[in-house]
């Protein structure tokens, strides 16, 4: 089971965590930026996740990453949490740690980022929005929004290649994960995992089973 740390802001709001109004929330104070500027909130999540790791196989995924420095800061906090748990005699297991690739910065730097983590999950919704400079919430721009844009597909291929070159497995989530027009393409690219909602499990699975690339 892969568990993502706090990922609110922009189109993801939570009643229990109020954020101030921002003119451009999609590029504002959200996701890992909240966790790194409010480390006690982050530590609370990490403590719970590592406690849970003693009872089952989990992995932790960090959203909205843009730099190696962020990952290294995350690792410092993770080590602090693990040290505190050891001192308290709390049992936990080592877990895989990965990141969301949902910004052009992360995609371009994916060869370097892959040296720091165990896996990538390509968040195609935000990656498309940021790459094409199109607000997904703006209906006036619907005709310009093209998730199949060659730039997006090239970026996905780059991330897959860079991840695999450093031993990271790579998955795809977001709307494109369930886009059956691209399932065959993703298999040819070498994708390791497609994350889809329950509604799309059967049609995507059928395509994978019948694909010549499924091996």
Question: What do these predicted regions represent?
Answer:
Residues 1-215:
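Conserved alpha/beta-domain cores
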């Amino acid at each position: 089971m892969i568990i993502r740390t706090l990922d609110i802001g922009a189109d993801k709001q939570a009643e229990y965590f109020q954020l101030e109004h921002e003119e451009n929330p999609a590029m504002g104070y959200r996701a890992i930026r909240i966790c790194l500027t409010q480390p006690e909130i982050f530590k609370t999540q990490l403590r719970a996740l590592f406690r849970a790791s003693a009872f089952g196989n989990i992995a932790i995924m960090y959203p909205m990453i843009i730099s190696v420095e962020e990952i290294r800061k995350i690792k410092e906090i993770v080590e602090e949490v693990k040290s505190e748990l050891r001192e308290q005699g709390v049992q936990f297991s080592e877990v895989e740690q990965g990141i969301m690739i949902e910004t052009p910065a992360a995609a371009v730097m994916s060869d370097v980022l892959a040296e720091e983590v165990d896996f990538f999950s390509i968040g195609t919704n935000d990656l498309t929005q940021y790459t094409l400079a199109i607000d997904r919430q703006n209906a006036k721009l619907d005709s310009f929004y093209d998730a199949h844009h060659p730039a997006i597909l090239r970026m996905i291929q780059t991330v897959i290649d860079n991840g695999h070159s450093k031993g990271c497995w790579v998955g795809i989530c977001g709307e494109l994960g369930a886009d059956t027009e691209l399932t065959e393409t993703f298999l040819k690219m070498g994708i390791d995992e497609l994350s889809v909602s329950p509604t799309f499990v059967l049609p995507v699975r059928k395509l994978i089973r019948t694909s010549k690339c499924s091996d």
